Amino acid sequence: MKKKAIACVIGAVFSGQLYAAQMPVAQAEIEPVVVTADRNAQTLDKAAPNVSVIGRKTLNQASAQNLDDIVMYESGVSVPSDNNRRGHAGINIRGIDGNRILMMVDGVRIPESYAGGGSNGAISGRDMVESDTLKQVDIVKGPYSALYGSDALGGVVNMVTLSPSDFVDEGKRGYFGLKHGYRSRDRSHGVTATVAGFHENAEGLLMLTRRQGHETENMGSDTSYSTARTATNPQKNNAYNILAKGNIGNERHRLETLYEQYYHANDTVLANSLGSQSRGPVTIATSESNARDRIRRQRIEAGYRYTGEGRLKEANLTAYQQKLRTEDDAVDASITRMGARQLGNSTRYSDYGFNQTIRGLNGRGVWEFDGAVKQTVVAGAEYKHTETARPRDSLTVDNLTGAVSKVYAGSTYPNKTFPDSKRKTFSVYAQDSLTFGNGIVLTPALRYEKDKLNTSTDQAYLNANPSGTATRFSDSAFTPSLRLSVPMGEQFTGFATYSQGFRTPPFDSATMAFANTTYGYAVIPNANLKSERSNSFELGMKFKNERARAQVTAFYNRYRNFINRTEIGTSTVGRRPIIQYQYQNLDHVKTYGAEASAAYKFLPGWQVSGSIAWMRGKQQDGKPLDSAYPFNGVLGLDYTQEKWGVGTKLRWSKKHSRVSSDTVFQAPGYGVWDVGAWYKPFKNLEIGANIYNVGNKKYWQHADVAGMSRTSVMDLYTESGRNFAATVQLKF
């Protein structure tokens, strides 16, 4: 028995992505967790090894404030970020990121990100869900198109918000909560108030959040207002969120309504853009550069839910609308010279936007059939209508004459980098989970999806692309998947999965037209893009007993027609060389790797846990895929009592040495130590504190610098040094 216990400890230390352990302080007991990855609630034990869950306790005790905090301790998952202005772009899962990752809130797709031609941040990112409103976050690592459609080519992230039933029921008809949090890295304060009520067949929830903060500090030491600056740019930000839910009905029939509004604003002094910069024979001296970025997301839902006792166990129908409105405005004052001759002295005012409206209707049913082979069938249909636009306007004022111009850097304004688009997507899907008498579970699934994209040109788009025409694109696909689960004794279960993926060209790739003669680059449209497709294989093993949990998985993904921005040549405007880029299909890209995780409660109150993730990514020319992460992991130790707990986590990564070019920055390896504690002195009060990067280590997150060329200011992209967070929660 002792040998078995020791083996479990060793496995936990060297294996892991602990269950429920993405936090500096973890609850020690191994308990079941419900996940919705298969569109049907089930315990984590029955889910494939590539599924993980981050729960509310984890989020609370990790002081999660944004997308990066949520996945901080999730090996193999990262968040590309630009802390100098834009913030968090989205999620990277197993080297695949951007809109190839399906991100949802309560099973409804959130708006797409827009990178604007490419950077590790995004002009419009996807960090637009308030973390204090989340009950849990389900993550599926790898393609999942059979159930979720073309957006799930690289994985799925479903953020599940809290519901009235999480606070009130017949036994407790009212709830009030207040939470305050502080984070030193950005000097931010956040306050969330929660009110919930229950009366007969009705229940309601209202959550209000307000946050205020500043720039996220890094380890850069140059604070000059010049291009040599390595400290993050000065910034003020504020945000608010409203989540309201109202449900009425009984145990069988229920009507559900939801309203959510998220707002985030950044005001940034672009200090690292000030001073003189050379562009060939031209020198630009910038004396003022300020940015104002705004994100507004609104979600409205209404639905009906049926819960039965016969073969039809559950059915629901949901109609929703989600609107995204972003503004990225800037003011820049500069003097342009060629040698000793002054070419211009002007101030530019830019007013850009990215807008997307999604309207949809989802229907789903769950049936159970008993017999020699037990069956659980999930089937449904979805319709989604998406409208996307990128309006841009700019005004340049000559500071000497007062003359006003609508032309800047070779572009006439107003313009649009891609035409307004309307996309209609219809899909049907079905999954049948067959459980045999010997415990073997075979789960085939199939989805059919039809996608139509129509664009419309106007003068604004023609200003950017004079030869542009309206474009129509239509494609459809069947995407199957097959999963096998085989019990191997009482404590072990083996898994094998095959799945296909499908993704139509996104709203901007085929039609983007953009040129910047000042910085010497242009993006050329490509109307011949094909839909991306993938074949994915996964093998895994799970282990569980009353005190321990472990899992290991290996994966191989092969992508065809992978859409990638490619340098296609050089043109000349005047005497200036212009590098031309275009989105093109790569014949094949492949990723493969392995992940392991474990958690072990080796003594009452004590838990050791850990996770590791290793992968490789290759492009069609054999060069490494820069977005593929280096070998990384997490190791944790926690002690928990009824009213208090302490814990520590070690986050580590090897050097990112596999890059596509010798000029690409290779992020050094690192080990970062975090500690935390929580205390519940009274039933209604809980306090928590965490210290991050205790050793004040200078390090880079791979996702923030993936594919970035080495420069003299790489410290600009470093993570925060030693910092702390504290929270206080009142619950009545």
Model-inferred region functions:
Residues A21-F167, R187, S509, L539:
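Acidic, small-polar-rich N-terminal luminal/periplasmic segments of exported/outer-membrane proteins
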Residues S165, R173-K179, R183-G190, T194-D293, ...:
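Periplasmic-side early beta-strands and strand-to-turn transitions of outer-membrane beta-barrels
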Residues G177-H180, T227-T232, I284-A291, G303, ...:
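Extracellular loop and loop/strand-boundary signature of outer-membrane beta-barrel proteins
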Residues H180-D186, H199-N201, R210-H214, N250-R252, ...:
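Transmembrane beta-strands of outer-membrane beta-barrel pores
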Residues G249, R254-Y262, I295-A460, T469, ...:
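Face-selective signature of the C-terminal outer-membrane beta-barrel domain
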Residues Y349, I358-W367, I524-K530, S536, ...:
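Outer membrane beta-barrel strand-and-loop segments of large Gram-negative receptors
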Residues G437-N438, L442, K450, F555-Y559, ...:
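Gram-negative outer-membrane beta-barrel transporters
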Residues F502, R558-N561, K655-V659, Y679-F732:
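C-terminal beta-signal and adjacent terminal beta-strands/loops
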